[in-house]
């Protein structure tokens, strides 16, 4: 048994509450164990200067943590006057991941602003942010469709993320909490689509090297978790999930 009593390939309890923020076009409050993140998607009717006139949309993300999201208080980055390298990396990861499953041509010249605010951190904040932000983004697109500002849902697949690692006592484990992450010999963040395609693989041998065989098992374990996360996304999105399935079939030619 792991630190919190889970099996090696078991996710922490996951819950998504949609429409959590009333002003945002799309919003989700996601909890993954004791990690809690508010994800919102806001629509801006313009694109960055480098994209003007191209007819395509854009998706970008911001990520932040409350000072007491962690055990010891952190100074707000706004007080420091600059973002940390970690924050910039996570913001780019979230935006990159979401863009991978959206047809930006069908979005038109609009920008989707994703905001992921961690209110409590216990490991896996970036993967929880991606998983929740995806749902918030789809909800925002649905609102645009209701308002006749989009003709169709521009999303062509599901998207979710989780962590895997090699624990010195338990071996390969899924969805690391903070204590597990701190002692892991190897840890990875994996982002995948509903079709089982990889969007991002971030892996590091913190205290040890790892073999190709272990890498394959890590990826297989991540896929187990991501399939479960996508099932939760489906339940949260309801009928919108069926529209995404249709889009995926059309894109792959499996109609």
Curated annotation (Swiss-Prot):
GO biological process terms on file: rRNA catabolic process; rRNA processing; tRNA processing
Keyword RNA-binding annotated: yes
Enzymatic reactions: tRNA(n+1) + phosphate = tRNA(n) + a ribonucleoside 5'-diphosphate
Family annotation (CDD domains): RNase_PH_bact
Binding site for phosphate: 86, 124-126
Protein keywords: Nucleotidyltransferase, RNA-binding, rRNA processing, Transferase, tRNA processing, tRNA-binding
UniProt entry tagged with the keyword Ion transport: no
Uppermost EC category: transferase
The enzyme's E.C. designation: 2.7.7.56
Superkingdom field: Bacteria
GO molecular function: 3'-5'-RNA exonuclease activity; tRNA binding; tRNA nucleotidyltransferase activity
Family to which this protein belongs: Belongs to the RNase PH family.
NCBIfam families hit by this protein: RNasePH
Subunit record text: Homohexameric ring arranged as a trimer of dimers.
Known role: Phosphorolytic 3'-5' exoribonuclease that plays an important role in tRNA 3'-end maturation. Removes nucleotide residues following the 3'-CCA terminus of tRNAs; can also add nucleotides to the ends of RNA molecules by using nucleoside diphosphates as substrates, but this may not be physiologically important. Probably plays a role in initiation of 16S rRNA degradation (leading to ribosome degradation) during starvation.
Xref: PANTHER family: EXOSOME COMPLEX COMPONENT, EXOSOME COMPLEX COMPONENT RRP41
Protein name: Ribonuclease PH
Lineage: Bacteria, Bacillati, Bacillota, Bacilli, Bacillales
Gene that this sequence comes from: rph
């Amino acid at each position: 048994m792991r630190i919190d009593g889970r099996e090696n390939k078991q996710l922490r309890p996951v819950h998504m509450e949609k429409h959590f923020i009333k002003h945002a076009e799309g919003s989700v409050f996601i909890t993954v164990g004791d990690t809690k993140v508010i994800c919102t998607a806001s629509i801006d009717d313009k694109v960055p200067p480098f994209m003007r006139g191209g007819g395509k949309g854009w998706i970008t993300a911001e990520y932040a943590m409350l000072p007491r999201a962690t055990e010891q208080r952190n100074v707000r980055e706004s007080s420091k006057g600059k973002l940390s390298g970690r924050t910039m990396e996570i913001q780019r990861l979230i935006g990159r991941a979401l863009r991978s499953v959206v047809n930006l041509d069908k979005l038109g010249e609009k920008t989707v602003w994703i905001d992921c605010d961690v209110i409590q951190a216990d490991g896996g904040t970036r993967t929880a942010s991606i998983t929740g932000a995806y749902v918030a983004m789809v909800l925002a697109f649905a609102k645009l469709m209701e308002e006749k500002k989009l003709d169709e849902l521009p999303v062509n697949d599901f998207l979710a993320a989780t962590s895997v690692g090699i624990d010195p006592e338990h071996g390969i484990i899924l969805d690391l909490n903070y204590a597990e992450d701190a002692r892991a010999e190897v840890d990875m963040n994996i982002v995948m689509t509903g079709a089982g395609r990889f969007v991002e693989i971030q892996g590091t041998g913190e205290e040890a090297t790892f073999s190709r065989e272990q890498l394959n098992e890590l990826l297989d374990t991540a896929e187990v978790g991501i399939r479960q996360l996508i099932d939760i996304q489906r339940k949260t999105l309801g009928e919108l999930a069926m529209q995404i399935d249709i889009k995926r079939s059309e894109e792959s030619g499996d109609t």
